[in-house]
Design a protein with these regions (language model features):
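Acidic, polar ligand-binding/catalytic clefts
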Residues: 99, 108-173
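Periplasmic-binding protein-like
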Residues: 152-159, 237, 241-277, 295-311
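A structural signal for short loop-to-beta-strand junctions that line the ligand-binding cleft
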Residues: 59-61, 93, 141-153, 247-250, ...
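Extracytoplasmic small-molecule ligand-binding "clamshell" domains
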Residues: 32-134, 291
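Short helix-initiation/N-cap motifs at beta->coil->alpha
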Residues: 110-121, 166, 206-219, 254-256
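Extended ligand-binding regions for polar small-molecule ligands
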Residues: 27-53, 95-104, 163-165, 169-172, ...
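Bilobed "Venus flytrap"/periplasmic-binding protein-like clamshell domains
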Residues: 74-78, 88-103, 135, 154-213, ...
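A ligand-binding cleft/hinge motif common to bilobed small-molecule-binding domains
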Residues: 117-118, 135-142, 191-199, 220-254
Length: 311
């Protein structure tokens, strides 16, 4: 029987108390993450927003009438996406943001688990109305998609808690290291760019390591087969808080935005942005990020197609 790729609350409870899941000192400026997975199964809702609803183009056809179909990660990537106690309900900050957007637009939410490789084609082909996948706004992506921002994109370098590595903040710090990174991601571009600089300086090469299974990534770090993980800070901080087996040693060099992604020119990005701003103003947005330990990645206003990486 094929096992679910998700970490469920039942699995987590074997490691930690179900009432107080995490209260661990993280690496950045005394940040403390306190995440109660049991309580976080209860949805955070908001009301309809007339302005956002009025901005939906009259000609727009949703994938399923009356529903907002949003692609989210099919792999376990807490706090962004994981399964609840019933082993089927998607929870996490991405699902919570999706629900706030759907509520604001007066629609029922339909979440569709998908792979990172699938969302671009799915959006282009009209399989999904939008994707919430920790997608960073870049100049290249804006040529094909529209974006409504909902979070600051912070990247982090994480190592085994007993690693001798103390700092990764510049290209020479990754010289000769094996680093787990996602294919086709912003962090991969940064890592490969640093490697090119190191090659030009005659420094040892970095070896990117690509894994699609979270358990394999964790095992690779703990066994010493790889030196570091470079990816979304929210995911790295969650793992560090959950097990205490990893720690952050640096952040990525660029600050960008994570955004709800829609088909280019279909007119849906603006009403989504308005719905997010409605949630920001009434406090439901802050509730979502706070309860998933992402409070240091809040935005004060959602915007459509902001300057991105490469602009």
């Amino acid at each position: 029987v094929k096992r679910s790729p998700f970490i469920t609350l039942t699995h987590v409870a074997a490691l930690l108390s179900t009432t107080l899941v995490a209260n661990v000192q993280a690496q950045d400026a005394g940040f403390v993450s306190r995440i109660d997975l049991k309580a976080n199964q209860t949805p955070i809702r908001t009301d309809k927003n007339a302005e956002a609803i009025a901005q939906i183009p009259a000609h727009f056809k949703f994938v399923t009438p009356g529903k907002l179909t949003i692609a989210v990660s099919a792999l376990s990537s807490p706090p962004l996406s994981l399964l609840a106690d019933d082993n089927k309900t998607l929870i996490g900050s991405d699902a919570d943001i999706a629900r706030l957007v759907a509520d604001g637009l007066g629609l029922e939410l339909k979440l569709v688990p998908a792979s990172w490789e699938d969302w671009p084609l799915g959006i282009t082909a009209g399989k999904y109305d939008a994707a919430i996948f920790n997608i960073t706004v870049t100049k290249l992506r804006k040529e094909k998609f529209d974006f409504a921002t909902y979070r600051i994109d912070t990247l982090g370098f994480y190592v085994k808690s007993t690693s001798k590595i103390t700092s990764i903040n510049k290209p020479e710090d990754v010289a000769g290291l094996k680093v787990i990174v996602g294919s086709g991601t912003n962090q991969e571009n940064i890592l490969l760019g640093w490697d090119r600089q190191n090659r030009a300086s005659g420094l040892p090469l970095v070896q990117p390591v690509y894994v699609t299974d979270d358990a394999a990534a964790n095992l690779s770090i703990q066994s010493g087969r790889v030196d570091a993980f470079f990816g979304p800070h929210s995911i790295g901080a969650y793992k560090a808080a959950l097990t205490g087996k990893t720690r952050m040693v640096g952040k990525g060099p660029t600050v960008a935005y994570v955004a709800v992604t829609t088909q280019k020119g279909n007119g849906l990005a603006q009403p989504i942005s308005t719905a997010i701003n409605h949630a920001i103003h009434n406090g439901s947005y802050a509730q979502v990020l706070d309860r998933w330990g992402e409070d240091d990645e809040k935005i004060t206003q959602s915007v459509v197609n902001p300057p991105g990486i490469g602009d």
